[in-house]
Amino acid sequence: MNIKKQLIIPCTLIGLLILIPIYSVVVNYFKSASTLSLKSTLTEVNLFSHLGKIVDIKDFKDTPTLLFFGFTHCPEVCPTTLSNLLNNIELLEKNKKNYRVLFVTLDPERDTINILNDYLQNFNSSVIGLTGELNEINKFAKNWNIYWEKVLEGDGYTINHTATVFMINKKGNFAGTIAWGESDKSIELKLKKLLNL
């Protein structure tokens, strides 16, 4: 019994030593994300849409936006995320709310304008693909605290990356996130709030 009591304090301290840094990282992440805006990050870079047009922040004025980073060779996470988002939004489309989904490639080496254009034919016209020079993509992704890493795979490579969807309100400011694997009910509630339904 005494041994158990003696272990409680050390174990508690060890637990706190582990949890405090994790908590700090999470809090700092959301603090930095909450100060982001689409305007401040898009105007710093030169990106092109899948239609070959230079991206202009004016195109997204007064439009709620969902921002997602991925790549066209992504086998599961990217197509599933885009499909789930659009399926949930379709349930709300009867309200005729305008919105945009920005799909930013983390693989501009392969994801040219033409490749992005072909890939996005699988989704509806609300999805806009963005690509550009690698340094421009890197800058934009880092501004949104995106983790990504090229991983060799067979004769080619894949990319491990953050699978979070960023919600941006019609003022262009960060309004929350949708996590990979989040339930449809949770996504629906968040989208209703974003779209003011």
Question: Model-derived features: where do they sit?
Answer:
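Short loop/turn microsegments at loop-to-beta-strand junctions
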Residues: 42-43, 65, 162-163
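Thiol/disulfide oxidoreductase modules built on the thioredoxin-like
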Residues: 136-190
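C-terminal alpha-helix
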Residues: 190-197
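Short, acidic, Ser/Thr-enriched surface-loop or helix-capping motifs
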Residues: 49-50, 169
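Generic structural signal for well-ordered beta-strand positions
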Residues: 55-56, 175
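Short active-site neighborhood of thiol/selenol oxidoreductases, capturing the structured segment around
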Residues: 58-81, 85
